[in-house]
Amino acid sequence: MEGLRIAGDTTSTVCVDGEGRAVSFIHSLAFTFGARLTVPGTGVLLNNRLGRGAYLIGGHPNEVKPRRKPLHTLNAWVYDSDTLGLLHVGSCPGGDGQVQWNMQVLSHLVDHGATPQEAVAMPRLTVSPGSDSNVLGHRQELRCEPGLDSATLSRLREWGHNVVEVPDQVGGPGGSAMAISLDHANGTLAAGADPRMEGIALAL
């Protein structure tokens, strides 16, 4: 198993069938081994998602209370059109970066006409720190992957962002995106898997 990444606790799958039905699924244990409890007789490990970002501090925006849905990072999406139906489906594990990265991938697909593989491989930006208690209060950064042009980085700095250039995409802070697009003109599907982590795009 040399070379395989063993860090991480979130998995995601996106799929589209021949009739255009789509699923975007994401599951996470939250911390390593989740709640460290299994459902008896099943081997299913329970997550500790509530314990990762919800607080017992009165008045905290993510305070645990009855009838509340605490903020969490899981984010899967399907993008469709009122006239055409399904256009794109995707997901991107990676903690607090998920919403940020999914929006960037979706923008590449919708606003810039990228293919799914192009969209998931493009450099990404990440606002940091996230919401985990161990990073709250850390200095604000805008982490930028390699490949963003110097003019863009300069403009971000002019706008007041504390730009931090990360050295590498692979295994870096950009998550592990995947996407599938449906071309209604010719009835074909195209898929992309992020080069940052292990993943694969398959036609079955």
Regions found by a protein language model. Name each.
Residues 151-204:
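In a subset of proteins, long, contiguous C-terminal domains/tails are tracked
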Residues 3-167, 174:
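Proteins synthesized as precursors that undergo proteolytic processing into mature forms
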